[in-house]
Amino acid sequence: MNLSWLTPVLETDGPFLSIYIDSTRTDPSSASGLSTRWGHFRSKLAEDGAPDEILEEIETTLLEPSPVGGRHGRAILATGSAILVDRVLPAPPREDSAHWATEPVLVPLLQVIPQAVRQLLVEVDRSGADLHLRAPENPKIAKNDNGLGEDASVDGGHDELHKASVGGGSQHGWRSSNQEARVEDSWERNAEAVAAKLDAIVRERQLDMLLLTGDVRAQSLLKDELGKEALAILKEVPGGTRGQSLDRASFREELARVTDEFIMERQQQLANTFTENQSRGGESLAGAAEVAEALQRGQVSELILTIGDEPDNAEELARQALATDAEISTLGAEYVSLPEGVGALLRWRDDATPSNSLSSMSGDPGRETAADPDSDQSPREREEESIRR
């Protein structure tokens, strides 16, 4: 994921407040629990030296009623005088945390990257469609609708929608056929209007998923009008009706299933890309020291961290990645085993790039056994020196 919106944080002088908290409010008890958990964090942060004024500002924004539904989290990064980042997380953090330190803490944010799915749900009928922008990238509390509104709609403006049932008699035949043609034309023109809107949103929002539900005939007409970019990310979700889909528990469950399936497929694709590069000696490498060196040389196009098994220098690696415009992704441990919990896809490699073979990567048992704590050389450097000899 491109996290360039974090760059201004790294260009600001610290110290920093880094707060990650489960902000789900499904009932009064969860809202009360949020207030209690924040109260404990606020006391700790004040003891650590965080100014009371900024803590008061954070408390106000954190505890105010939120329109965001479902399970989610909140990430707040601030200096001692101003909030720099206030973001809704697409899932609660792995654990609540709050820090007052010289550098911002980023790993809890990175751990929920896989759940950040940019998707648009389209409930279509023969007159138009209702649009729901769900889990957009980097949603803000103040503008969680991202310009669409919670229930944005598109109406084609062609309202002759129903074919009449006309009794027998040849005198009615031409009228019936003519009306049917006008109705079909209205449906098609309405589909064109919806498709034009969706194509524009797909281009502007860089969506991951376009979810389509509603009237079966309207879906078919809409698909005939959509551009290639929209069709490439289209997924049909059965059981929906315009204006009613999200009120149905069964539909919400199906929507969650389709989204989870996409997340798993995307994780597997990233793991496959990394593994394929490793197996053919391509533009990838792994291991904390190797990745750090590649980041310093500006070689990394995408930093990859294992969720829950990040290396000790993960925060430093993340800052280096942001400083060199590298993307950052996180993978579940079940998808790939990254030595020391870190790997990278490279922009390029040369003779100075660390070896890409599995036997030479950090995390290899033989290599770790050969480590000499009294030596200033890394295992890789000693291996290369032995080869030269």
Question: Language-model features: where?
Answer:
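Terminal alpha-helical anchor/extension segments at protein ends
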Residues: 1-389
